[in-house]
């Protein structure tokens, strides 16, 4: 992969479930080493897009390339460099935290599972409950464990679905700070699905505004705010949600996010 090859390149992507068009012909790129958000309300197509990127769903039409590899044809070559974190994906609740992480470490083919768990336990402040059943943890603790699971294989691409959903403000702020530091220090590429405007403004180089399966506008958070003449990304989001279109009635096609 050359330095110019994007981490993600999506071209003409469609996904239909019967007569429902969940993803409606979207195109976007994500630069390697950047952080991008899929921003939209419920039913916008964010999670479906992530599921296609993870190889969990096959697109109806279109192409998805991850690090230059076709995701549909060569997912076995792509997946080892990726991982996924979501508060909605439950780890086996009867297993202890360390048992869960050990199982996943072996599934990822790691040779140094114990060392990697110790490192992440320290970084994510989960050492105190490594030997507790995962089902006994608070939502904030489970979110940290889910992140540890997702980072075990040191992914080049980390996909996150609503990473701070249902967290109290203090824990949510800690998670955002950790993701910010992790991306900066590791150089990994992050793609997150969210409808938390403050989170997106803080973390992201590029925002893809989604509505009813389509990308209706895109750009850096500050550029979107300026383009719509607003003070916050939340106000931009509400403008788009109420109008059903992007600024000036047409999407901005500039896809260049810089790290």
Predicted feature residues:
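Conserved ABC ATPase "signature" region
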Residues: 102, 106-129
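Conserved ABC ATPase signature
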Residues: 133-137
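Conserved catalytic motifs of ABC-family nucleotide-binding domains
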Residues: 154
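Catalytic Walker B motif of ABC-type/P-loop ATPase nucleotide-binding domains
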Residues: 158-162
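Helical segment within the ABC ATPase nucleotide-binding domain
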Residues: 173-185
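ABC ATPase "signature
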Residues: 218-219
């Amino acid at each position: 992969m050359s330095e110019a090859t994007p981490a993600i390149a999506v071209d003409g992507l469609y996904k239909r479930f019967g007569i429902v068009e969940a993803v409606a012909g979207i195109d976007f790129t994500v630069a390697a080493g950047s952080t991008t958000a899929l921003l939209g309300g419920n039913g916008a197509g964010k999670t479906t897009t992530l599921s296609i990127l993870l190889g969990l769903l096959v697109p109806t039409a279109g192409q998805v390339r991850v690090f230059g590899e076709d995701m549909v044809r060569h997912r076995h070559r792509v997946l080892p460099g990726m991982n996924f974190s979501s508060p909605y994906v439950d780890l086996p609740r009867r297993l202890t935290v360390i048992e869960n992480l050990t199982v996943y470490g072996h599934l990822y083919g790691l040779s140094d599972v114990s060392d990697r768990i110790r490192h992440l336990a320290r970084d994510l402040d989960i050492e105190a409950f490594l030997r507790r059943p995962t089902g006994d943890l608070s939502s904030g603790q489970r979110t940290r464990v889910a992140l540890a699971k997702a980072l075990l294989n040191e992914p080049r691409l980390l996909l996150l679905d609503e990473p701070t959903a249902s967290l109290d403000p203090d824990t949510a702020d800690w998670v955002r700070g950790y993701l910010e530091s992790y991306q900066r220090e590791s150089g990994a590429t992050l793609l997150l699905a969210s409808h938390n405007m403050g989170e997106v403004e803080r973390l992201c180089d590029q925002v893809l505004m989604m509505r009813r399966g389509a990308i209706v506008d895109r750009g850096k958070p500050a550029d979107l705010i300026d383009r719509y003449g607003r003070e916050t990304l939340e106000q931009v989001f509400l403008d788009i949600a109420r109008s059903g279109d992007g600024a000036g009635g047409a999407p901005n096609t500039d896809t260049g996010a810089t790290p």
